[in-house]
UniProtKB/Swiss-Prot annotation:
Source domain of life: Bacteria
Protein family: Belongs to the UPF0181 family.
InterPro entries: UPF0181
Species in which this protein is naturally found: Cronobacter sakazakii (strain ATCC BAA-894)
Protein name per its UniProtKB record: UPF0181 protein ESA_01442
Intrachain S-S bonds: none
Length: 60
């Protein structure tokens, strides 16, 4: 699977981590917090995007 992902600076990545930790401290699960922050980044990010390939590691 290929996806256009926002290209974030180290500072932006750190801000995302801090936001996730803040949401978790308010009682949100880690999965929900990550999903919410990812959605926020996609909605507000302006800048370059990277192309990433995700492979399924599980053998069927």
């Amino acid at each position: 699977m290929f996806a256009g992902l926002p290209s974030l600076t180290h500072e932006q990545q750190q801000q995302a981590v801090e936001r996730i930790q803040e949401l978790m401290s308010q009682g949100m699960s880690s999965g929900e917090a990550i999903a919410q922050v990812a959605q926020e980044i996609r909605a507000t990010h302006q800048g370059d995007r990277i192309v990433a390939r995700f492979e399924d590691d599980e053998e069927e």
